[in-house]
Swiss-Prot record:
This is Transcription factor GATA-4. The gene is Gata4. A zinc finger (GATA-type) spans 216-240, 270-294. One of its GO terms (molecular function) is chromatin binding. Keywords: Activator, DNA-binding, Metal-binding, Methylation, Nucleus, Repeat, Transcription, Transcription regulation, Zinc, Zinc-finger. Residues 60-82 have a biased composition (Gly residues). Expressed predominantly in gastric mucosa and at much lower levels in the intestine. Also expressed in testis. Methylation at Lys-299 attenuates transcriptional activity. Interacts with the homeobox domain of NKX2-5 through its C-terminal zinc finger. Also interacts with JARID2 which represses its ability to activate transcription of ANF. Interacts (via the second Zn finger) with NFATC4. Interacts with LMCD1. Forms a complex made of CDK9, CCNT1/cyclin-T1, EP300 and GATA4 that stimulates hypertrophy in cardiomyocytes. Interacts with NR5A1, ZFPM2 and TBX5. Interacts with ZNF260. Interacts with TBX18. Interacts with PHF7; the interaction promotes GATA4 binding to its transcription targets. It comes from Rattus norvegicus. Residues 411-427 have a biased composition (Polar residues). Residues 316-325 have a biased composition (Basic residues). GO terms for biological process: aortic valve morphogenesis; atrial septum morphogenesis; atrial septum primum morphogenesis; atrial septum secundum morphogenesis; atrioventricular canal development; atrioventricular valve formation; atrioventricular valve morphogenesis; cardiac muscle cell differentiation. GO terms for cellular component: chromatin; nuclear body; nucleus; RNA polymerase II transcription regulator complex.
Length: 440
């Protein structure tokens, strides 16, 4: 069981054992002050601490084995004249073990005082802490094996000779800050967080919004979203600054006159008719304002509009609904006959009324011998109304016609035949009447 301890101890000390600032560097036994050969203190490597039999209930035996191994490992590396059997650990008992620092070699200039040794231990502990944080768990195990001064060991409590160093870090820092409070009372440091006038970049003018009494040198504005400066350093409002930056000149203070609408142009009068009310103002060839009526008249006719056409009121266009013509059906005069598709009774009644009205409008001359031929005048008028389909278009023609018993002039006959192309029986009726003459 102890062969592994001896083999691990013979492999050499752990890394950092030969450091000049380490707490165990060049430590010797009590009688090694005059020896020219220096043997480092044998320490248990970190690989041994990970063994399971060194923890738990057998910690006391492991402590004895460790101390025995330490004392027995000394002669293996010692030269002639080295005192053997002087352990680096003076263990009085299993529970009351305390570390006694060995004497320092006279060849080195380290004074054997507790303060210098504490400083060296502090430097070594700092290096070990850095190595532990960077190397992970393996370095942590090595650090646990090398920290013999401030941690309880296997089964015994080791009293540390450096209680001040191992105290609370926060308390030590607070005490150090309180002891050295003089440098922190510098007015330079105290003025950093609470300066009354914070420095700003000269190009950033956004902080100037909160300043009081600032006025634009161009337009006199007291408030603006962003204060700007001109080339001479004077303050300009955002509008004046942008105008000066884009155009290179100062922003004009007089606003341009806003163009009034046609209904708000007060003071204008037509150069032709002198009216002051119009829906649209126009200009003539000379550039003078004229009303809409005079302008359109001059544009269409090329001459000025006569003053007699002037009206006090404005004539507007009477617009009709677009669907008005679609809803209405074509209407004729009261004497108009219905289409032939209607009933026979309605057709005959309409034909009678149309014939009576047509007879009243036009004079008809007949001879006594030919009266029998015109006994059915209603049928003849019905023929004309049926052919035309619209009484309004045929009535003026019938009103200008006259029937006379002097022969058959050809123009009237051709006109009647042309109007009755679709009805062949109409020509037969006209052929039977030998005595009527239609003259224009």
């Amino acid at each position: 069981m102890y062969q592994s301890l001896a083999m691990a101890a013979n492999h050499g000390p752990p890394p950092g054992a030969y450091e000049a600032g380490g707490p165990g560097a060049f430590m010797h036994s009590a009688g090694a002050a005059s020896s020219p050969v220096y043997v480092p203190t044998p320490r248990v490597p970190s690989s041994v601490l990970g063994l399971s039999y060194l923890q738990g209930g057998g910690s006391g035996a492991a402590s004895g084995a460790t101390s025995g191994g330490s004392s027995g490992a000394g002669p293996s590396g010692a030269g002639p004249g080295t005192q053997q059997g002087s352990p680096g650990w003076s263990q009085a008992g299993a529970e009351g073990a305390a570390y006694t620092p060995p004497p320092v070699s006279p060849r080195f200039s380290f004074p054997g005082t507790t303060g210098s040794l504490a400083a060296a231990a502090a430097a070594a502990a700092a290096r070990e802490a850095a190595a532990y944080s960077s190397s992970g768990g393996a370095a942590g195990a090595g650090l646990a094996g090398r920290e013999q001064y401030g941690r309880p060991g296997f089964a015994g409590s080791y009293s540390s000779p450096y209680p001040a160093y191992m105290a609370d870090v926060g308390a030590s820092w607070a005490a150090a800050a309180a002891a050295s409070a003089g440098p922190f009372d510098s007015p330079v440091l105290h003025s950093l967080p609470g300066r009354a006038n914070p420095a700003r970049h000269p190009n950033l003018d956004m902080f100037d919004d909160f300043s009081e009494g600032r006025e634009c040198v161009n337009c006199g504005a007291m408030s603006t979203p962003l204060w700007r400066r001109d080339g001479t350093g004077h303050y300009l409002c955002n509008a004046c600054g942008l105008y000066h930056k884009m155009n290179g000149i100062n922003r004009p203070l007089i606003k341009p006159q806003r163009r009034l609408s046609a209904s708000r142009r007060v003071g204008l009068s037509c150069a032709n008719c002198q009216t002051t009310t119009t829906t649209l103002w126009r200009r003539n060839a000379e550039g003078e304002p004229v009303c809409n009526a005079c302008g359109l008249y001059m544009k269409l006719h090329g001459v000025p509009r006569p003053l007699a056409m002037r009206k006090e009121g404005i004539q507007t266009r009477k617009r009709k609904p677009k669907n008005l013509n679609k809803s209405k059906t074509p209407a004729g005069p009261p004497g108009e006959s219905l289409p032939p598709s209607s009933g026979a009774s309605s057709n005959s009644s309409n034909a009678t009324s149309s014939s009576s009205s047509s007879e009243e409008m036009r004079p008809i001359k007949t001879e006594p011998g030919l009266s029998s031929h015109y006994g059915h005048s209603s049928s003849m008028s019905q023929t004309f109304s049926t052919v035309s389909g619209h009484g309004s278009s045929i009535h003026p023609v019938l009103s200008a016609l006259k029937l006379s018993p002097q022969g058959y002039p050809s123009p009237v006959t051709q006109t009647s035949q042309a109007s009755s192309k679709q009805d062949s029986w109409n020509s037969l009726v006209l052929a039977d009447s030998h005595g009527d003459i239609i003259t224009a």
